[in-house]
Amino acid sequence: MKYEAIRKTVLEAILEAVEKGLINGTSGNIAMRDSEDRNIVAITPSGISYTGMKPEDIAIVERKEDGTNEWIDGNYKPSSEVPMNTEVMRRRPDVNATVHTHSMYATICAMGENPELKPITPPQCEFTPVEIV
């Protein structure tokens, strides 16, 4: 299986997030950049229960020079949040992984009055500069 190591890492991370209550059902996702080819991103699939997944179910996406993304491998289509995850990675070369969660704790933080921490939605990433990630 191609990209086996990165797929296993993403699968282990999503299962730990589910176990700790950070992600419920299929809401949320984890994406990780490949260490050898930084245009390759492994991301959890869309609409699939995480608890029954295998490494080959993790989607592989290739980031293109024009800013688009192409699903190149995986049993299931990638999360609909691919544009948000890859845009963060494009703007922040130091970021190698993203975790998108709807956990109660993340929601509370996003509702706070900290001017340094701004909530980010997928449409914002496409049309608004992402200042802090």
Residue ranges and their predicted role:
Residues M1-V133:
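Glycine-rich flexible loops
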